[in-house]
Amino acid sequence: MNNIQKSRNNRIIAKTAHKSDIIIGAAIGYSDDQIKPFILSLKSSGYKGRLVLFVDKLDSGAVSFLIEQEIELIWQISHRDNAMPVYGHRYYEFLDFLRKEQGVKRIMLTDVRDVIFQGNPFVGCGDESLYVFSEDSSVKLGQCPYNSEWVLNLYGNDILKKISGEIIICSGVTIGGYHNILGYLDLLCNEMSINPQIPIADQGAHNVLIGFQVSLSSTTNQGQYTLFTMSAQTGSELIEMEDSLSMMEADRL
């Protein structure tokens, strides 16, 4: 039995993991090089909770690396007969999974390929709040052609006009208490169901929900934080990050 077969048949929960904190992401079609920055920076952050990845179409190197790192793998995200793109459908999978979990107090929903950690992401986060994270505050949503298009496609021009002056909130990372995250996911999935085939519907729905949904009491972080989303970095900045991660990996060997 190879590593891929083993990983499909077993859920590994690290024996030292604190069960009350959980980080959830999706990794579809990634190589080990695409996953390592996320995993290695998290391992070096001091985080002691669970990490669950919904995965499929990983190469053998990525599977071997994730098994070695004792990551919980769930092989199902792209197996359902669903027309919604995987980056939207993952939230339905997350919601189904979390509804069955017990003893969870704090949750982080996150992208994988473009996120690195600079510390424990839950430091300073309570278990009765919802935390969202802005992109460059100098660029408003209406000034970004991509975010404008995602909102326009899902909601139309009237909603886009109302939200165009707001800062852009990144849907790639959301942190909160168990009930706060479940409430957020319920609302997000309902919004994306308006038109399930729209690309990047999660980003458009996320910004509208945070901007207008009264029941979502959220805290927006615009300053330095313990994680970093690589959305629009220069080549020199990425080279510096790559060098730091290479040293991080060498230290673990």
PLM regions and their residue ranges:
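N-terminal anchoring/stem segment of glycosyltransferases
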Residues: 1-89, 96-104, 179
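Generic preference for well-ordered alpha-helical elements
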Residues: 32-35, 91, 114, 171, ...
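A structural signal for short, well-ordered beta-strand segments and their strand-loop junctions
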Residues: 52-54, 106-111, 131-133, 175, ...
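Short catalytic/ligand-binding loop motif for oxyanion handling, primarily in non-cytosolic enzymes
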Residues: 61-63, 115-119, 124-125, 139-142, ...
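Active-site donor-binding segments of glycosyltransferases and PAPS-dependent sulfotransferases
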Residues: 70-91, 234-252
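GT-A fold catalytic core of metal-dependent nucleotide-sugar glycosyltransferases
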Residues: 93-146
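Short, flexible, basic/aromatic active-site loop/helix in glycosyltransferases
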Residues: 148-165
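Catalytic core and acceptor-binding pocket of nucleotide-sugar-dependent glycosyltransferases
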Residues: 162-253
